[in-house]
Amino acid sequence: MTTETRSLYSQLPAIDRLLRDSSFLSLRDTYGHTRVVELLRQMLDEAREVIRGSQTLPAWCENWAQEVDARLTKEAQSALRPVINLTGTVLHTNLGRALQAEAAVEAVAQAMRSPVTLEYDLDDAGRGHRDRALAQLLCRITGAEDACIVNNNAAAVLLMLAATASGKEVVVSRGELVEIGGAFRIPDVMRQAGCTLHEVGTTNRTHANDYRQAVNENTALLMKVHTSNYSIQGFTKAIDEAELVALGKELDVPVVTDLGSGSLVDLSQYGLPKEPMPQELIAAGVSLVSFSGDKLLGGPQAGIIVGKKEMIARLQSHPLKRALRADKMTLAALEATLRLYLHPEALSEKLPTLRLLTRSAEVIQIQAQRLQAPLAAHYGAEFAVQVMPCLSQIGSGSLPVDRLPSAALTFTPHDGRGSHLESLAARWRELPVPVIGRIYDGRLWLDLRCLEDEQRFLEMLLK
């Protein structure tokens, strides 16, 4: 060991001496004596490793208390941190999809603080059914005979197939064999449910006769899968649910549909592209329709199945239903969200998802212009801060080819170096409330479609 190395080792403080320092008293009160000591031992090991490797002391050795505080503060942060979503994707899967309405937040808080009538019937003091209240709401909204709720739409599809078609064939168009995030593929789900997939048609064209020829004595279902996360365009042919239901009645085979994102209102009335609605498919005679709670519906993560009473009864009695059932917080949030749909005139104001999707480009443009000046003053030495038009997307596999005109604040480095954009984006991710944008075409873009709290936004970026 060299003299220089020995000198560096000698500069490392003893743990008991550090703990006697007044700056560590509050740290021990906040994080506990044991955790502070554990971290100091870890940091001493790190410092010795740096000395061995580079013959220097880590920079943080100048202020041990400050480094311990920084590390423990970061460690204590929740894994689910609030962020400001300026990615341009409204229903961002990685950021939790739909924001909940205030009514849903209040309902969840109440369900967490107090015992609730989850499976208790107040009329006869007997055991109730956890889906009953929501089933009544869903039937009122969609016109279905009954409903079933599980923890997400993937679970809904799995339960729907396992309870009604296990050991039998399910006929699906080849152009509808979708894969969603996480490599969740319809063929794989069918295998897991114990079904045999019977593909018909081609990728771009499937006719009624393709389904007819596929039906045999082992056919359990005719299935439609809404291709919500991609679009096949050009020379195409697909039959709709009404035509498939007519064929199913002729052949005595029920029709089920995985609708995916599942909007409960006609989005075209808000100037958005129209998505098929569960109530339309129920009216067409589809036996079961599944859809998500946390996409266009704007509620919590949930899988919702509506349809014919006898079919829903098979789902409710299947062993998988208990494994996949939703908890009381999910049910509370979903009920509160569904009740908003009973008053459609106020929906775009009270439902955050719809409110954000329907913000006009003009309003967002004015907001961007208002925020440009303070940000340009703060970042102008390194970046050109501009207001630019952009296109938002709905996200979570909803309306994949449709974009929403929006406006963004863009940051372009004066020296043109992309590394400066990466550094800026990284700095913003380290803020107490991280600001998440996207880097594209030599700029860092902050799409303001989802920005409602301007004060918090400026507090973060002007730090």
Curated annotation (Swiss-Prot):
Pathway membership: Aminoacyl-tRNA biosynthesis; selenocysteinyl-tRNA(Sec) biosynthesis; selenocysteinyl-tRNA(Sec) from L-seryl-tRNA(Sec) (bacterial route): step 1/1
Subcellular location field: Cytoplasm
Modified residues (N6-(pyridoxal phosphate)lysine): K295
Pfam families, per database record: Se-cys_synth_N, SelA
UniProt-listed GO biological process terms: conversion of seryl-tRNAsec to selenocys-tRNAsec; selenocysteine biosynthetic process; selenocysteine incorporation
One GO MF term: pyridoxal phosphate binding
Gene3D superfamilies in the cross-refs: 3.90.1150.180, Type I PLP-dependent aspartate aminotransferase-like (Major domain) (3.40.640.10)
Catalytic reactions of this protein: L-seryl-tRNA(Sec) + selenophosphate + H(+) = L-selenocysteinyl-tRNA(Sec) + phosphate
Keyword presence, Cytoplasm: yes
Keyword Cytoplasm: yes
Required co-factors: pyridoxal 5'-phosphate
Gene Ontology CC terms: cytosol
EC annotation from Swiss-Prot or TrEMBL: 2.9.1.1
Keywords tagged on the record: Cytoplasm, Protein biosynthesis, Pyridoxal phosphate, Selenium, Transferase
Task performed by this protein: Converts seryl-tRNA(Sec) to selenocysteinyl-tRNA(Sec) required for selenoprotein biosynthesis. Requires selenophosphate as the selenium-donor molecule.
Subunit and partners: Homodecamer; pentamer of dimers. Binds only one seryl-tRNA(Sec) per dimer.
Family: Belongs to the SelA family.
Protein name: L-seryl-tRNA(Sec) selenium transferase
Species: Escherichia coli (strain K12)
Gene field: selA
